[in-house]
A protein has these predicted regions:
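Active-site- and interface-proximal helix/loop "cap" or "latch" segments in soluble metabolic
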Residues: 124-204
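Conserved helix-adjacent loop modules within structured domains
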Residues: 1-119, 125-130, 134
């Protein structure tokens, strides 16, 4: 985690080593300290398979619910044979998963319902002109009041992080342009800024 003081702009990083429990890897969730960690921890789980203990919604965020494996792990099978595009509808679930360790150190799952019986749910997207991109939001409303929003991301995710591992820096620039057609230059500028900072390059 990278934490920043919004007044002084001081930054500090907090690193946590994942603990292995059987064949799974776990770290404590910080969602109760910082609510912004919600989607970030789900993204780590989706791509790397690390379960965040105490997070109330450890579902996939970018990949399909029936996707097998964790694509940013070094041992992930990248062969086309193991990653055929499914031709079936994506299975839906009305439950979330929360993982914790019991008194004997075993990983146990607790399930929570997404919606109450009297909830009114509006599916916003995945194709809607106001989103300016492919995005689905399961929106729980009470009259004109939005009670909760469950985002479904990744409809145009291409695994660019994995592709960039075998590219030179100049080769990656064309990929960042395709992240979002509305702000292609912003993504390229962000990547170039990180590369320059890592190389110690000062612009004049």
């Amino acid at each position: 985690y990278i934490l920043e003081n919004t007044q002084t702009h001081e930054r500090t990083s907090v690193k946590q080593l994942a603990k292995q429990v059987g064949e799974e890897y776990v770290v404590p969730s910080v969602i109760r300290l910082w609510a912004d960690a919600d989607l970030l921890e789900r993204e780590v789980f989706d791509f790397l398979g690390i379960k965040f203990l105490g997070h109330p919604d450890m579902r996939r965020l970018f990949m399909r619910n029936d996707f097998t494996g964790y694509p940013l792990r070094k041992d992930f099978d990248m062969s086309p044979e193991a990653n055929r595009f499914p031709m079936t509808d994506e299975p839906e679930t009305d439950w979330t998963s929360e993982w914790n360790l019991d008194d004997e150190g075993r990983l146990v799952e607790t399930r929570h319902r997404l919606f109450d019986e009297d909830d009114f749910v509006i599916n916003f997207g995945p194709n809607h002109p106001s989103t300016h991109g492919v995005l689905r939001l399961q929106t729980v409303v009470d009259g004109e009041t939005i009670k909760h929003v469950y985002p479904h991301l990744g409809y145009i995710h291409r695994g660019m992080e994995k592709m960039m591992e075998s590219m030179t820096y100049p080769q990656t620039l064309a990929l960042t342009d395709r992240l979002n057609y509305l702000c292609a230059m912003h993504h390229r500028h962000a990547l170039v800024g990180v590369i320059e900072e890592a190389m110690g390059v000062e612009l004049t």
